[in-house]
Amino acid sequence: MRTIVVAMLATSLLGGCAATTPPPKAHPIRINEDPYPSTYTRYPGALTVIRGATVFDGEGRRIDNGTVIFGDGVVKAVGDASLASPAGAVEINGSGKFVSPGIIDVHSHLGDYPSPGTSSLSDGNEATGPVKPEVWAEHSVWPQDPGFSRALTNGGVTTLQILPGSANLFGGRSVVLKNVPARTVQGMKFPGAPYGLKMACGENPKRVYGNKGGPQTRMGNIAVTRATWLRAQEYKRKWDKYEKTGGDMPGRDLAMDTLRGVLDGKILIHNHCYRADEMAIMIDMSKEFGYHITAFHHAVEAYKIADLLAANNICAVMWADWYGFKMESYDAIKENIPLVHNAGACAIVHSDDANYIQRLNQEAAKALADGIRAGIPGLSEAVAWEWLSRNPAKALGILDKTGSLKPGKEADLVLWNGDPFSDYSRPERVWIDGAEMYDSADPKKRPVSDFELGQPGEGDVK
């Protein structure tokens, strides 16, 4: 009898233990961070040698009577006239001409504010609330925007970042594109390029939301932005814990997914900001919440804090002389770009305009001339080309892939019919990943979108 009682008691105790042991946690489900992947494939190209041209390599070097060899999508060699041509290569006489890396525009709205500029195609600002990190510019980009081909043929632009507008404090994700004809935006997406997040400070969010419930002041802008980062930090903590230990999956929030990507260092901040004091505040905020600002865009007062930008490894994305169109753009100077460069910071020329993007070489020429007139040391055409290719590639997180003519990098380059710092020079031929996308002498190599076919001005080169 005693044996039976002991056995029953043991069974009861074991049953109790089983009842209180929690079930194993479910394994965490990984979120697909790239649901709209690039489908880009490079166009076919040929092993090519350009010989006898003046070469700007994008790293500050000028080579007179230079030679550039590229094939299989990449730069093979860059040097002087002594470089031997590989067997079977296509030879191009570059005498009297210039070769440069393809221009990279880090601030464009081609595709989300396309031509023709009708309200039905105006898709750059989701102005329904000041915090919209959940929207993605690529979902507005129209690949048939005629501006893409104009930027290529008139401007030698081979890569560009398409941003949301600046109505919102958090405007949404940007996308980096190869400037190639494609039926879908995914067919243009630069493989491996990180996403960006457009942020804005200053007048634009105040103007848009001042009568819509706010914010209506600069301090309101900052308060809303800080509160949003607090939410993002909490969201990140929940998801980090879940991905480490499993269990019940936290609720998804597309806006917070983007901000978590920033806090994880996977998404780069591109911050619309004009005034020096506001840029300094944004830098302090980035340190408060643990993220890094990749670039300030427009940055007309960058010259006032160039040392601060250099110390924090932040690029300034600037115009040569476009200012005074609103109060926060008033206190600009024409020497802004060369002064930022001279301080050791990352200086970039940008367009923010469908016409300027066709003449970024001329914008750099103006900034260079203004810097030389001011007596800023160390400036040259070869150095200024860094503002058009190398530094933009750095700001987009693709410097290991493009931005300069170095062996192994993607063969994105332009053959100019003269000095590209002259108003009278223009692209003669353009290659992207070693594929010739434009030849001024061959009408068949002037990309025209399907939208333009059969319309007046089809494929015009101005």
Q: What are the residue ranges of the model-derived segments?
A:
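Sec-dependent signal peptide recognition
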Residues: 1-7
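C-terminal motif of bacterial Sec signal peptides marking the signal peptidase cleavage site
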Residues: 15-16
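His/Asp/Glu-enriched, well-ordered alpha-helical/loop segment
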Residues: 39, 44, 115-116, 122-135, ...
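Histidine-rich, glycine-flanked metal-binding segment
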Residues: 31-35, 40-46, 55, 59-100
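C-terminal cap of metal-dependent C-N hydrolases
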Residues: 53-56, 394, 406-450
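Polyanionic/metal-chelating signatures
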Residues: 147-297, 426, 432
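Divalent metal-coordination and catalytic microenvironments
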Residues: 53, 68, 73, 96, ...
